UniProtKB/Swiss-Prot annotation:
This is Levodione reductase. NAD(+) binds at residues 17-42. The active site is at Y165. Its EC number is 1.1.1.-. Belongs to the short-chain dehydrogenases/reductases (SDR) family.
Length: 267
């Protein structure tokens, strides 16, 4: 089975909530899960991104049920609103891909402003916490649920020039493990993925920061240290997320899964 092929019934009648659903990993995962029968609640700060993701989902799965909600994941009231919208529409939340995030500026720590640090941590860590806080209550009352948080290889090792991103993603790893220990007794599994160099709009922007004049050269040089010598693709991440949210991963809990072509082992 390839990363883009899938069973057709694994998520039938299951409701999956995806933040950051308007692009990149969120969109690819939405398409994957819809192909497997999921009902989707997609959340993003971009209404245009959400509409594009919904169109991509319906192209793959014309009968899919898709709810879209524009929200800033760092705003508690907006998080409450997207969770409420999901439960009012579907009645439950079986899976949660807690994925929204930004990269932020690339600067050494002494040049990384407090304002930029706060911005990145607010979205990448506070946003993950707020989503968990609201969704876990629902899952506990249901007696079941699966969560996948998006961390990063930058959350399991040092990467340099990204103080806010590294701090937030390390925090996501800690939050994942702590919450998994707390909620396993309620039939809830909480894991995280740690993507590496996956070619998404975020990584493309990162290359532009590294070399504004020649981002393609920066991209080619960056990937040479990766044992796989290539960038990953969003559907490859979606396949792992789908596994972790499915019953196939029924005894996988409190785990952080690198999806990086061997990058974290080589550094």
């Amino acid at each position: 089975m390839t990363a883009t092929s899938s069973p057709t019934t694994r998520f039938t009648d299951r409701v999956v909530l995806i933040t950051g659903g308007g692009s990149g990993l969120g969109r690819a995962t939405a398409v994957r899960l819809a192909a497997e029968g999921a009902k989707l609640s997609l959340v993003d700060v971009s209404s245009e991104g959400l509409e594009a993701s919904k169109a991509a989902v319906l192209e793959t799965a014309p009968d899919a049920e898709v709810l879209t909600t524009v929200a800033d994941v760092s705003d508690e009231a907006q998080v409450e609103a997207y969770v409420t919208a999901t439960t009012e529409r579907f009645g439950r939340i079986d899976g949660f891909f807690n994925n929204a995030g930004i990269e932020g500026k690339q600067n050494p720590t002494e040049s990384f402003t407090a304002a930029e640090f706060d911005k990145v941590v607010s979205i990448n860590l506070r946003g993950v916490f707020l989503g968990l806080e609201k969704v876990l209550k629902i899952m506990r009352e249901q007696g079941s649920g699966m969560v996948v948080n998006t961390a990063s290889v930058g959350g399991i090792r040092g990467i340099g020039n990204q103080s806010g991103y590294a701090a937030a993603k390390h925090g996501v790893v800690g939050l994942t493990r702590n919450s998994a220990v707390e909620y396993g007794r309620y039939g809830i599994r909480i894991n995280a993925i740690a993507p590496g160099a996956i070619w998404t709009p975020m990584v493309e922007n990162s290359m532009k920061q590294l070399d504004p004049e020649n981002p393609r050269k920066a991209a080619e040089e960056f990937i040479q240290v990766n044992p796989s010598k290539r960038y990953g693709e969003a559907p490859e991440i979606a396949a792992v997320v789908a596994f972790l949210l499915s019953d196939d991963a029924s005894y996988v809990n409190a785990t952080v899964v690198p999806i990086d072509g061997g990058q974290s082992a080589a550094y």
